[in-house]
Amino acid sequence: MIIRRASIIFTTIFFLVTMIFIFNYKDTIFALIFGILQFFILFSAMFFITGQWLRSINFASIVMFVLFMINRLSLYYYRKALFANDFLLYLDYENWDILIDFKELLLVVIIILFLLGFAIFAYSKNEKANLKLRMSGLISLIILVLVHTKIESLDIVKSEWLKTFPELKNTYMNISMTIGNNSGLDYKSPTFNNSYEMFKNKINTVTNYEISNLKPNIVLWLNESTLDASFYRGNLEQVDMFKGDFKFQTLNRVHTFGGKTWKSEFEVLTGLSPDEFGASSSLVFQYAAPHIKYSLPKNLKEEGYYTIALNPYPGSAYNSKNAYKNFGIDEYIHPNELKCDGAGDKIRKLKYITSMQMGECVKKIFKKYENKQPLFIYMLTINEHAPYNRAKEVKFGLNEFYDESQSIKLTDYYERQIELSKAVINFNDFMLSTNKPYIFAYFGDHQGNMGLKNNDVKFNNFTNPLNITGFYVKGSNGVKEIKNNLMNLSELSLMPSVLLELGQIKPNDFFKANYAMRKICNKVDDCEDKELLESYKSYLYDYLNAANK
């Protein structure tokens, strides 16, 4: 009797909380409608299966509560609202290592599983309704699903949903609008109303850069979770990798925070923003990659380059090997295949391989493929990724600026950045020693998730400062400098044309446009001329069919 009363109280609480979520968290009437529809779809499905009223109310309430909480977790760890197709990533066991990185998440998952268990099995001994009433549950389920499908397909609903970007506060509407065709699983290229004529005319006004037969070896190094730590509030000294002479340097807008590295990989390799793919922006490696017509590796291959990707994860992780192949990478290499230090005895996720060890791996690639030069090597290091729990004490006077939790995380972050800097400088010294033309570029895919706020970054003049990282290029004497102020904000999607210009490599039609946009505005999403911005995107997607192969 006591257990039953406790269960009823438990169910009542979840029902009331779920109703608060549905009726309170809405920016549009359609968000409310979708929340109500989802609740009654879940209720009807469970009632048809079990014929038990209380069990069905309990099930619908808890599942709706869990969806809301998963959305909060997504916002905290990835700074991204939950979409229905995100569950494809969450259910892929290759991505479950996040539970090891963030042990508090494991506890949350256990709690969620417990709640779902209670949602499914509680009140299973209650009296069941007769068959007619259960069939009414099936009929109402069918009607509700049809109504849901119809509403989500209406143009006015899509328009209202798009108005909620980028905040996307309507949890249940976001889920509804990313189910089925709206999710991008039935692939459709982005389109911008064929408004490309303006940009098409402007391209002809841009002076082309010098093209030669220099053909430098190119290394593009993704520094995981990296932003020059001296940009954070405090008195952290700038490490050596961000000092000295550069062939090019800039701050860039990126389209992810704290994770989902593949979004920045997609951007720097294709010259396209993942956000253009809307609800499927987190799945660009799975659903957009096969349709990409142009890419930096493809352009380089046309000019005689052999293209290689070095990744500390197996090729199955986030579909990376297949995606790289779609982008024109000739060969995918895991450090284990080269018997690199820290690579272990089999191909697996190397979350703790150091950046110095990854740099040594690239040196082995140069030796192994000496006869296939010029080489383009795309690599990424992982050691700088969260969680930042290795520091034993707060250092660098950070406790004067942050609470203890953030101070110790930033201490760990900075200590890892010091080691990364040593690896970067060491590798650049190696490239110098080859006595061959080279370009060595390195950049941050996103900032690390340390619980910092916008005002903890010294970017007062920029919106969304947590979505900004740096891009730095060193090179041999024959590589001519592109003069640029570091604080002149650009975008990661424009960086492929930087590498082509530095290498004096002939661009294809896509990267001619990429170069022109960089010269005209130097930004994409932050470009002040919104008419130019739309025309540029239309030129890429509507005129060149860049994502419609």
For every predicted segment, state its role.
Residues 1-10, 24-35, 48-56, 122-132, ...:
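Generic structural signal for short, solvent-exposed loop/turn connectors between secondary structure elements
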Residues 1-168:
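Transmembrane and membrane-interface helices of multi-pass
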Residues 31, 100, 170-177, 255-259:
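Membrane-interface micro-motifs in multi-pass membrane enzymes
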Residues 34, 107-112, 200, 269, ...:
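Generic detector of well-ordered alpha-helical segments enriched in charged/polar residues
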Residues 73-84, 101, 188-195, 334, ...:
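A diffuse structural propensity rather than consistent per-protein peaks
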Residues 149-220:
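Membrane-interface segments at or immediately adjacent to transmembrane helices
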Residues 207-213, 220-223, 228-549:
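Solvent-exposed soluble domains appended to multi-pass membrane proteins
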